[in-house]
């Protein structure tokens, strides 16, 4: 059975991704900072729960030890946890605001990936799926026909540009693990103020990559329609 960990999966796109992968027969671990809500989400889905705050070294290390003891390996890691943070125009943006967003969206991804890499390498076909965004695409944010061009989210967007580049660099440096990035698109969750398509569509790209098995590629950046322009 495929063992999968999804960070930030107690609600929204992460929760829907977990639901679909449980339905597909995977053993899914829901990683969440909020233990109460995380356990409730896991119980509803028939998944496992591990408390995991991606901004805290000790929390991430403890979560990795829990999976090592109870699962022995990790087939798929989905770095889904992310925050929008305080929205500020570039001319009013401070280093502190940027650092706060990067701590979860970028440093958290690196922290979790580093901690779980030994468990991934213990799997037959290990895979890491990083949730990025079209708001981090140079092409899309400059295309007036795209919704991404309408949101001046410099801090969040640049954090997702970093996620995309990290994915590509991981893929180049670690050929024994598949690394791919997926863009859910504008999805109607608490994160977006309920604007956009449904979570079913938002989870589609991650679910597709997570169910490819031995055919999983590496170094790709996609949304549910195909290759995401960089």
Where are these regions (language model features)?
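A glycine-rich helix->loop->beta "capping" turn
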Residues: 66-79, 85-86
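Canonical Rossmann dinucleotide-binding motif of NAD(H)/NADP(H)-dependent dehydrogenases/reductases
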Residues: 1-29
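Catalytic loop of short-chain dehydrogenase/reductase
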Residues: 83, 87-102, 121-172
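Hydrophobic positions on the long internal alpha-helix
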Residues: 78, 112-116, 120, 166-167
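Conserved glycine-rich Rossmann-like NAD(P)H-binding loop of the short-chain dehydrogenase/reductase
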Residues: 24-40
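The beta1-alpha1 cofactor-binding region of Rossmann-like NAD(H)/NADP(H)-dependent oxidoreductases
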Residues: 50-62, 95
């Amino acid at each position: 059975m495929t063992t999968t960990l999804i960070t930030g999966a107690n609600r929204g796109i992460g929760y829907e991704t977990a639901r679909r992968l449980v339905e597909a027969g995977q053993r899914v671990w829901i990683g969440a900072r909020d233990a109460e809500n995380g356990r409730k989400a896991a119980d509803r889905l028939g998944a496992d729960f591990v408390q995991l705050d991606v901004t805290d070294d000790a929390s991430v290390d403890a979560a990795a030890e829990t999976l090592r003891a109870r699962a022995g390996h990790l087939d798929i890691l989905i770095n889904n946890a992310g925050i929008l943070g305080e929205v500020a125009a570039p001319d009013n943006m401070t280093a502190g605001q940027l650092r706060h967003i990067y701590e979860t969206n970028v440093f958290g991804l690196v922290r979790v990936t580093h901690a779980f890499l030994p468990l991934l390498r213990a799997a037959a076909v290990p895979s890491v799926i990083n949730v990025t965004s079209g708001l981090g695409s140079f092409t899309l944010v400059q295309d007036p026909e795209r919704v991404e061009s309408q949101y001046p989210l410099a801090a969040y967007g640049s954090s997702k540009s970093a996620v995309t580049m990290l994915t590509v660099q991981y893929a180049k440096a670690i050929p024994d693990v598949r690394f791919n990035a997926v863009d859910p698109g504008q999805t109607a969750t608490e994160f977006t103020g309920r604007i956009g398509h449904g979570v079913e569509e938002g989870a589609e790209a991650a679910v597709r990559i997570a169910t490819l098995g031995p055919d999983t590629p590496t170094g790709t950046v996609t949304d549910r329609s195909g290759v995401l322009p960089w």
